[in-house]
């Protein structure tokens, strides 16, 4: 019996990853980075910027600044942006899967499935963001009194993602926050 494996043609050189703060890729303030290893080979495949407190402070300032704009955007506009992100996720699913396989050791088909499901999640939350309504609640004690519930974005949200589902878990958190008008700070594995 012959057992063979195939690699997709989309396997690429793993990128050295910087921090994404205020819409720009940047090195960590201290210039530190950590090695990323392929778990199948044990070889270093790239480096990732190692954020410290000054980087977190910059990210929080940027998230607060972004929140001031994002929260005032109409839900239909946020929906369009998020649907574009979902389309890009689908378009780049093979490359995303290749990187996940290299850095996580995740089987290629599972990695591609994770990217595709993440795109579905982004769309679902984008559509839910169109339905963030308030409500009127009658008083339990006085029928002439009503309470109005207004749902407002609360501000920047922090999200941490585990190593085993690094895309899906962060997308579940990020898409919900963005759809409701909040900005994000994400700590990946």
PLM feature segments, named:
Residues 1-40:
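Hydrophobic face of amphipathic alpha-helices that form TPR/SEL1-like repeat modules
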